[in-house]
Every structure is written in C-alpha cells, then in structure tokens.
C-alpha cells in the first residue's frame, strides 16, 4: 500500500530570467531630460549595465543608448514607459 501526500499550497512559478537588452532612445530637451529617462529605466529594468548619452549643442534630438537587465515580460512595458515621456521621440531595441 502506498500513501501519497500533496501540498495544498498554490503553485508559484519561478521568477522570469533576466535578459540583457540594448535600448536606443532619441529625445528632445537636452541634458535636463536625462534624469527622467534614467529613472524610467531603473523603475522598469532591474539594472543598467551601460549608459551612453549624446547631447550636442545646436542639434534638436539627443540620443541615449543603454543596456539593461530586464525580464522578457517587462520589456514592452519598459519601452512603452519611455515612449510615454513627453521628451522622447522614439525608443526601440538597438
């Protein structure tokens, strides 16, 4: 005779594996916009590995390229959050 016991605890899946993604963001407003962009990255991504910003005098759009660790499920939300910022012209995977 065998006796099997099953746990009644609900199944919880393991956290999603984080992946490294490179994101290119183009924005207007110059250097004053960088803190808001970085805040958005850190709120939706887990860790910023690389960050490069190119702001030039007399040029309308500036660019920021970042490499972040993010779960695959949160990637679209991160890109959408960047695009919702009023200073952002575009945000795409690089």
Sequence positions of predicted segments:
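Long, contiguous binding/interaction regions
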Residues: 1-61, 69-94
């Amino acid at each position: 005779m065998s006796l099997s016991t099953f746990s009644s605890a609900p199944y919880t899946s393991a956290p999603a594996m984080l992946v490294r993604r490179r994101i290119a963001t183009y924005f207007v407003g110059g250097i004053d916009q960088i803190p808001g962009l970085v805040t958005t990255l850190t709120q939706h991504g887990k860790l910023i590995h690389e960050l490069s910003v190119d702001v030039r005098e007399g040029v309308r759009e500036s660019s920021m390229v970042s490499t972040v660790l993010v779960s695959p499920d949160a990637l679209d939300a991160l890109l959408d959050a960047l695009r919702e910022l009023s200073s952002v012209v575009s945000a795409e995977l690089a």
